[in-house]
Amino acid sequence: MAPPSVFAEVPQAQPVLVFKLTADFREDPDPRKVNLGVGAYRTDDCHPWVLPVVKKVEQKIANDNSLNHEYLPILGLAEFRSCASRLALGDDSPALKEKRVGGVQSLGGTGALRIGADFLARWYNGTNNKNTPVYVSSPTWENHNAVFSAAGFKDIRSYRYWDAEKRGLDLQGLLNDLENAPEFSIVVLHACAHNPTGTDPTPEQWKQIASVMKHRFLFPFFDSAYQGFASGNLERDAWAIRYFVSEGFEFFCAQSFSKNFGLYNERVGNLTVVGKEPEGILRVLSQMEKIVRITWSNPPAQGARIVASTLSNPELFEEWTGNVKTMADRILTMRSELRARLEALKTPGTWNHITDQIGMFSFTGLNPKQVEYLINEKHIYLLPSGRINVSGLTTKNLDYVATSIHEAVTKIQ
């Protein structure tokens, strides 16, 4: 008799929630259905948007006979890495001028986080540092915990961030938790458009956060997935990152170009490394090269070429910033419209937090039972946390979504 399959005891894993939500949405035959769960931009017709500048650059690449499909270097396309880091740090960054910045092209922002996490687990503040505490915000993007756990970190903690009662930032709780963190702990910070809350610290609050982190010797690991996409302004969305440079921090910054270029399936990311001196950066990159070699070995070229071509050409760059502002402005408009409708309906509670928040997501304050009601009774798909993708709202579905939220809040406590 043949032995059972070697995979017979493998348990069925739980599906990734946000993708299951989209699958459920697709299978729903109800014509009223609305998908507010997907983490991607949608037009007012609820369609994905290929940025006009991206179409233009893709055509340019297709017609360039000098390009080929040879392997890129392990660390990625040099021009892309340089342009990406410059976008985060600014043209006049002292770190760039002093040549103490490095970049690693990665498979999206997740890949940048993972390469950074793997490096820190091996080399941060010595060797084999898997017991170093890693702090993530409460709440945070669910993959943060998973990535650092997979890299081997054994002590992942949360710092307070969201005040559910006032529906805003719990600054004092955040500062207290960082103040009490062991020295040299790693702290994951959302550079802008905090996911899932959409609530960001002000510049003054960032200064307080930096002050605590500096005297506790905490290591910042920025996640910058929405530069330009949050406020429509590239500089404003990078303010925190640039302030930390000015304060002399060494840090990592995981960058994603999925949202601000609409290149979701090209997996275009960059890990920017800021150190104290050029020689240290070279050593760090030499070790990261070893990590990349056993992870994906060489990154893909197409998305990196699109981003590098755009960022390095003044005319294309200007067109791109216009495209990004188009997306950011539509989201801001949808926020205002949703809030106005809920207030007009006299929906119980306060709704100013919808317009106080920025970026793609809004943390509505809806509880899991209300979310369940919206999914099952109204065919409006959103995460159990109450997070919605604001770009899933359109001029055609706004009234339906607002009245449905009103109904859920009124009927379900």
Curated annotation (Swiss-Prot):
Uppermost EC category: transferase
Residues binding L-aspartate, per UniProt: G39, W141, N195, R387
Gene3D superfamilies, sorted: Aspartate Aminotransferase, domain 1, Type I PLP-dependent aspartate aminotransferase-like (Major domain)
GO MF entry, a single one: phosphatidylserine decarboxylase activity
Annotated InterPro entries: Aminotransferase_I/II_large (IPR004839), Asp_trans (IPR000796), NHTrfase_class1_PyrdxlP-BS (IPR004838), PyrdxlP-dep_Trfase (IPR015424), PyrdxlP-dep_Trfase_major (IPR015421), PyrdxlP-dep_Trfase_small (IPR015422)
Assembly and oligomerization: Homodimer.
Protein name: Aspartate aminotransferase, cytoplasmic
Naturally occurring in which organism (per UniProt): Pongo abelii
Species classification: Eukaryota, Metazoa, Chordata, Craniata, Vertebrata
